[in-house]
Amino acid sequence: MSVTANKHLVRCFLSHFEKGGANELLEMMGDDATWWVNGKPHLFAFAGLKTKAEMRSVLDELFAFFNVGLQMEVRSLIGEGDIVAVEACSHGVTKHGKRYENEYHILFRLRDGKIVDVREYTDPMHAVEVMQ
């Protein structure tokens, strides 16, 4: 796929967060895909390396916190070859009325029109604070 097509695919992927679309997110990932989030897993349950299969429960748990989903605002997006890098921020309201606004740098690797690797850098302590 071209860099332009890869960037479009990543924008589409991020748009599914707004709808709480775990199924759609997983469908866009390759069967052997992995997703890594910075942080210490014993302090932040979403941290560490997860397989696509493990991401089902992670995404279900994430979307269960919110009234609708998370709006992902893309601030910058750069692509080269099979890699797309995104700087973004999220906006959402939890079911308990807390505002969730986090910052991200996410590195995507794509293969054959599917996302095969996600490396997400975010503020895990903000997530812990809001989701408790």
Name each model feature, range by range.
Residues M1-D31, E129-Q132:
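Short, low-complexity N-terminal intrinsically disordered segments enriched in polar/charged residues
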Residues M1-T4, F46-A53, R99:
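Residues at secondary-structure transition points
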Residues S2, D60-Q132:
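A beta-strand edge to alpha-helix "cap/lid" segment located at domain peripheries
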Residues V10-F13, E24-L26, A33, M55, ...:
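Hydrophobic pocket/interface hotspot
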Residues R11-G20, L43-F46, E61-F65, E87:
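Short, mixed-charge, low-aromatic patches
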Residues N23, H42, Y100:
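Short, flexible micro-motifs
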Residues G30-E80:
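A solvent-exposed, acidic/Ser-Thr-rich amphipathic alpha-helical stretch
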